[in-house]
From Swiss-Prot:
Function: Probable ion channel inhibitor.
UniProt family annotation: Belongs to the neurotoxin 14 (magi-1) family. 01 (HNTX-16) subfamily.
Organism: Cyriopagopus hainanus (Chinese bird spider)
Pfam families: Toxin_22
Location(s) in or outside the cell: Secreted
Chief subcellular location: secreted
One Gene Ontology MF term: sodium channel inhibitor activity
Protein name in UniProt: U11-theraphotoxin-Hhn1p
Signal peptide start-end: 1-21
One cellular-component annotation, GO: extracellular region
Length: 113
């Protein structure tokens, strides 16, 4: 009867120790898989970020081209007072001191070139 108990105890100890080894091995495999998954997610995230940056650059390029081709805005028309140091006269106009009329205002006006 003692041999049966000893045999049973020996088998039980071996099963428990081998089971724990399998558990540790499974845990290590799971860690490796999660690390691989994380690296894949990092790669996918970086790829998506690059695509978004390229798209943003294209959109900003289109905006700058559009602003270059758009009409002039916020300019001063003909016969309107302007600042001598910062003339904002429309294209084709120049900020000049008036010849006859308006000299008493001591101001500059936008005139045709």
């Amino acid at each position: 009867m003692n041999t049966v108990r000893v045999t049973f105890l020996l088998v039980f100890v071996l099963a428990v120790s081998l089971g724990q080894a399998d558990k540790d091995e499974n845990r290590m495999e799971m860690q490796e898989k999660t690390e691989q998954g994380k690296s894949y997610l990092d790669f996918a995230e970086n790829l998506l970020l690059q695509k978004l940056e390229e798209l943003e650059a294209k959109l900003l390029e289109e905006d700058s081209e559009e602003s270059r081709n758009s009409r002039q805005k916020r300019c001063i028309g003909e016969g309107v007072p302007c600042d001598e140091n910062d003339p904002r006269c429309c294209s084709g106009l120049v900020c000049l001191k008036p010849a006859l009329h308006g000299i008493w205002y001591k101001s500059y006006y936008c005139y045709k070139k």
